[in-house]
């Protein structure tokens, strides 16, 4: 169990410091050495030596076989000054801890001890606990189990989910403090039991906030709890985690009834069950996990029925209906249990650059995992072109540099065995990497450089490649042109109900006779291609999809202009038709993005630099062409349109709806500059 790693036995040293400062022994006899002091609210008599030093036996962290702060063996008489140990982990001499003290058994110098006590008083003063607002008062009331005060503060508008300056909430305070009545009131007021603590460890939090670690430690123990290990990380712990640490059955039951997720993990990857002791709390958590998983499964199934995966993907990806349908069907089989559990899903995405292959993989990972950072693993296979670079994939063998670090793939698969793994541009990888993939795709497991086996049968592997992209693009354009001509012929025959469709389908004959031989010649092994579940084809964009891409880019820059410069950007409908001409099949959507930057954003930047755009103005992008009808048929431009290419201009719309075009001075082009020697 991990409970011993986060709890301590007795009162920690900071309360001893506070007791020392407040003790009357410092006010009589010049701080005599043999006077007892009262420490905090626990009433533990300690001497001055105990106040300045921490012994492993008196305030030990419950790590099996280790001392409190030294990490030594149990029973060692190692003594470490707490002040220095809390700040840097180094054990100074007694003279460093108590200025003016000549030896451990000697009488301390009054002046030196007074300076040390004054410094500690300043530390405590920095973290005075007087609540300055309702949220801070709510934290205090929750810790003190003052139910009446909690209700009063909530009725006056205190935020029930407000966080302490170090990251925890009032519900977490009540849970760790065994205050069941306060937990009930907070849950009834709408407290979220699934919020995670932002507090990590004392030293990390102190470093992040730029304060002394002792200040953070005093605040953590006074405002939250004094029995938690200050070296452990609590980031992401929920109120249920803390209730389990407190081993409070009634509060655990209240939180579960209030909607707490028993499967939620903290930053260390631990669920509340991992911290439970043997007993009623553990039984309750196991039962709750089973029920919660069943409810979650039904809820996700209902959500998938109402909002299918294909619709979610289409919100982020323009076009590629066939690719989305293929991936969606495979994911649906996996989610509903209609798949081979002994083998992972493997996809190969084929198509030209900038056409949505990587984006589809990202959106699939976002759909499958809440945590997209851990749930999506991307490896650029161009980094594995040499034979010796295979070691980076699974880790170096024993005796070589990097053996302890592990491989890029195996290390991440250990953290998330069911991740979506993207092998980008797999055609550039060395053949030895493909040999490793054979085992990965066939058996769903991988052995790293240390000899450990990672089971990843539940993962989804996606490979992208530009192999045969020219053949796919030419074939798709030919099919689209044939479909367009067929639709026009049927319209010419007075079939008024005919609609022009941009949807085309790659034939099986083309896949088997054209694409597969190219793949076989490149990868040089049939067994590798035979382990791929689906080969997904990405086709060039049609005209309507290009219009969507242009509008998407213009909307992006309109939003940027409004946020950064308070400028409203509008455009005519013909602008999209003009920008579509910049599309290049080889570069996909990137060519549209670059065309918008060249023809629109360049003008905006030049006008802004020349101080032609007043703040809060409204701009409109127009097409400067006397014959706009030339833009109506972008597939078959006339010779006249080629001689007179349309240009884009910016104009300002005044408050009275009058417009005037901006006179933007063309910047100097580098290729037109003549250098003289």
Swiss-Prot record:
For this chain, the Swiss-Prot or TrEMBL PTM comment says: Proteolytically cleaved by protease PARL. ATP-dependent protein disaggregase activity is stimulated by PARL-mediated cleavage of the N-terminal autoinhibitory peptide.
What is the role of the protein in this entry? Functions as a regulatory ATPase and participates in secretion/protein trafficking process. Has ATP-dependent protein disaggregase activity and is required to maintain the solubility of key mitochondrial proteins. Involved in mitochondrial-mediated antiviral innate immunity, activates RIG-I-mediated signal transduction and production of IFNB1 and pro-inflammatory cytokine IL6. Plays a role in granulocyte differentiation.
Locate the residues binding ATP: 316, 318, 353-358, 425, 466, 531, 590
Q: Known InterPro entries for this protein?
A: AAA+_ATPase, Ankyrin_rpt, Ankyrin_rpt-contain_sf, ATPase_AAA_core, Clp_ATPase_C, ClpA/B, ClpA_ClpB, P-loop_NTPase
Q: Where is this region: Disordered?
A: 64-103
The record's comment on protein family reads:
Belongs to the ClpA/ClpB family.
| UniProtKB keywords | Acetylation, ANK repeat, ATP-binding, Hydrolase, Mitochondrion, Nucleotide-binding, Repeat, Transit peptide
Q: What is this protein called?
A: Mitochondrial disaggregase
User: Which GO molecular function, any one, fits this protein according to its record?
Assistant: ATP hydrolysis activity
Q: Which PROSITE patterns match?
A: ANK_REP_REGION, ANK_REPEAT
State where the protein is found.
Mitochondrion intermembrane space
Q: Where is this region: Regulatory?
A: 477-505
State the species of origin. Rattus norvegicus (Rat)
Entry note about domains: The ankyrin-repeat region is necessary for ATP-dependent protein disaggregase activity. It plays an important role in stabilizing the substrate-bound homododecamer by mediating contacts between the two homohexamers.
